[in-house]
Every structure is written in structure tokens, then in C-alpha cells.
């Protein structure tokens, strides 16, 4: 069902992409396209919330941009608070008056996990506040099982999409121009 929603909304894209991790791929998942259609965003959020319900989550936090809408929709179904972390001078922060209390049970959610870099940054940020990060959830896991967050990781769909280091990218070797659709904005 999730893959069909991604295809129907145009979220599953083909081409030559530079991922937020810096790696290259011939396929890209742009979940912002999925969230153009609130009815599909609701389906995805509810399904992910069902996976995370067993963790007794009090607050759901997503990294901007991919986790902003997702954290809201998942939190609504879990009857939890929804926050997002965003970059300030290249560093993940809780801004806009957001906070977590020491010991608060938090789920971190992200639309797509490849290397898990943004999620790991959010987990470290939340630990600085003393939060108890109990799980991570994503719509898509394209890590190939290589990511360890130190807490349970739940995803709605595992996609084995090709990922290349830039120096090994066959698309670069063919001279195909690359597009950088991500939003990580690292310095």
C-alpha cells in the first residue's frame, strides 16, 4: 500500500540525485510530494503511529524538513506532542520555544532514512535535554539495514535503492547531470 501511494503521488523519482548524505542514487523518494495530498499523509501517518504505539510515546520529534509534517500527523494519532528540530548555522536545534523534559518519552520520525545522519543528530540533541528517546520511525528505510540508532527502528517500507559514493557513481561516469533535491543544508 505504501509503495503504491508513493508511486501514485509522484514521490518515487528516477534520475541522478545527490542525497543529503552526499551519496548519489538513480532513485529518490521525495515524500514532500506525498504530503501534497493530505489524505495520503494521513494514511502514512496513521500506519506509522500504529507501529510506534507500543513505545508509549509522549512527544514526536522530526528533523526539518522531512520530519516536520510527519511528526505532526504521527503525534496526532498517538495523542502526543509534535515538535521539530531545525538547523541553525548548520547545527540541529530545538527553536520556536520547543522543549522536552528530562525523562520524556520521545519518538524521532523521518520521512526517509538512508545513512540516518539527521536522525542521529536529533537523538543527540534530545539527549542533551535529558529526553528518553524510545524509538525511531520512518516512512522509508533505504539504509539496507546498516543504520543503528541504539533504539528500535520501525519503518513502513524498506526500499533497496542503489546508493553510490560520488567517486564510484556510474551516473557521474556517464556524464549524467545530478540534481540535489534534499533539504539538509549542511555547512
From Swiss-Prot:
Keyword Transferase: yes
Residues the record lists as binding 5-phospho-alpha-D-ribose 1-diphosphate: 110-118
CDD domains: PRTases_typeI (cd06223)
Domain of life of the source: Bacteria
Annotated family: Belongs to the purine/pyrimidine phosphoribosyltransferase family. PyrE subfamily.
Entry function: Catalyzes the transfer of a ribosyl phosphate group from 5-phosphoribose 1-diphosphate to orotate, leading to the formation of orotidine monophosphate (OMP).
Protein name from the UniProt record: Orotate phosphoribosyltransferase
Source species of the chain: Thermotoga maritima (strain ATCC 43589 / DSM 3109 / JCM 10099 / NBRC 100826 / MSB8)
Protein encoded by which gene: pyrE
